[in-house]
A protein has these predicted regions:
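N-terminal secretory signal peptides that target proteins for export/translocation
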Residues: 1-12
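Long compositionally biased, domain-poor regions of proteins
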Residues: 5, 115, 135-136, 244-251, ...
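Bacterial N-terminal signal peptides
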Residues: 13-27
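Bacterial Sec-dependent signal peptides at the C-terminal "C-region" and cleavage site
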Residues: 26-34
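Flexible coil segments in periplasmic/lumen-exposed cytochrome c-class electron-transfer proteins
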Residues: 34-107, 147-157, 161-253, 289-325
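Detector for the c-type heme attachment site
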Residues: 111-118, 143-145, 172-176, 258-264, ...
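Short cysteine/histidine-rich zinc-coordinating motifs and their immediately flanking basic loops
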Residues: 120-126, 266-273
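Extended intrinsically disordered, low-complexity coil regions enriched in Ser, Thr, Gly, Ala
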Residues: 127-153, 262, 273-279, 283-284, ...
Length: 325
């Protein structure tokens, strides 16, 4: 069960639809100086671009603690990219330095993907994904086949093959858990996208807004998310009927032929069950418009080109509703 929930037609080629969707090493807090923009022709809701007008917010300060953890950290230290907090070290094997960070590290994998590997919507859930697949995706970033000039492109170009291997093997060894709850609604809570962490948050004014043709993903525990607590999951609001429509598209496409029973992965083919809907949608849009390439993406391009925006929302919603293992 997700922890802390808000306290209070398509051809059989859809079987390869998400073969190139597996989580990639996408860092969410990497380059604060890079201007984030939505690629032309793509829906802005999928890219978590911070609102220009920001409501006042209270940021964590001083010593912070995560519920259920015996550890504590200085908020300012763990807010950067070099020293991700390890709130629950007994829940995973010892991480390599490229993941854990520390002295001499500029960007630690765990700062955006968390020590659990499950990340936030602006990053990716890579827990339990095949090491060979993750290594291949890093090679795509390094060659430019996958484009992310603000984040993963620069990281891939400066990360050694050995560090990539160690990080991939670490994340592949982890067991994913349910990290997102998908809720269908026509009127989700009113939200805004915060500059800090690029997370969509509940608007302090309250109220609701029409869902329209969007996926709105918010932290179930905003403070826990900001201090990178791996137990602080997310809620994804999606249009009514999305899950059933997505299930129909996935089943008619026979996607389990590639992704295995329950869409939990098979061999080097990645798990797509339980991935965050916003992340999946973003990858589908990226494939359609050319910023996601490489051998794995090539057979998907003609398939993704036929999908409507509502199809992408539905497929992403259904995958997010599935148990990850």
């Amino acid at each position: 069960m997700i922890r802390r929930i808000l306290r209070a037609s398509i051809s059989t080629r859809v079987a390869v639809l998400v073969c190139g969707l597996a989580p990639l090493f996408i860092a969410g807090h990497l380059n604060a100086q890079a201007e984030l923009t939505v690629p032309a022709g793509l829906p802005d809701w999928a890219f978590n671009i911070p609102d220009k007008v920001q409501p006042s917010a209270v940021r964590p300060q001083g010593i912070v603690k995560a519920r259920g953890s015996a550890k504590e950290y200085e908020a300012a230290k763990i807010a950067g990219n070099a020293n991700p907090p390890d709130w629950f070290p007994d829940e995973h094997p010892a991480p390599p330095k490229v993941v854990a960070g520390g002295e001499g590290t500029r960007f630690a994998c765990g700062s955006c993907h968390l020590m659990s590997g499950q990340g936030h919507p602006e990053a990716a859930d890579i827990a339990g994904q095949p090491a060979a697949y993750l290594i291949r995706q890093m090679s795509y970033y390094k060659s430019g086949a996958r484009k992310d000039d603000a984040r993963m492109g620069p990281i891939a170009k400066t990360t050694s093959d050995e560090d990539v291997r160690q990080a991939a093997e670490y994340f592949a060894s982890l067991k994913p858990s349910t990290f997102v709850k998908v809720i269908e609604t026509a009127t989700p809570p009113k939200t805004f996208i915060a500059t800090a962490g690029r997370h969509r948050q509940l608007h302090p004014d309250g109220g609701t807004e029409p869902i329209g043709h969007r996926i709105l993903e918010i932290p179930a525990d905003p403070l826990g998310t900001e201090i990178r607590d791996p137990h602080a999951g997310f809620i994804a609001y999606v249009p009514p009927g999305s899950i059933a429509k997505g299930e129909e598209l996935i089943k008619s496409g026979q996607c389990t032929q590639c992704h295995g029973e329950g869409l939990k992965g098979k061999g080097e083919v990645p798990r797509v069950a339980g991935l965050q809907p916003l992340f999946v949608a973003r990858q589908l849009f990226d494939m359609r418009y050319g910023s996601s390439a490489g051998d794995a993406a090539a057979p998907m391009k003609p398939v993704v080109a036929k999908l409507s925006e509502d199809d992408i929302i539905a497929i992403s919603s259904y995958l997010g509703s599935l148990p990850p293992r």
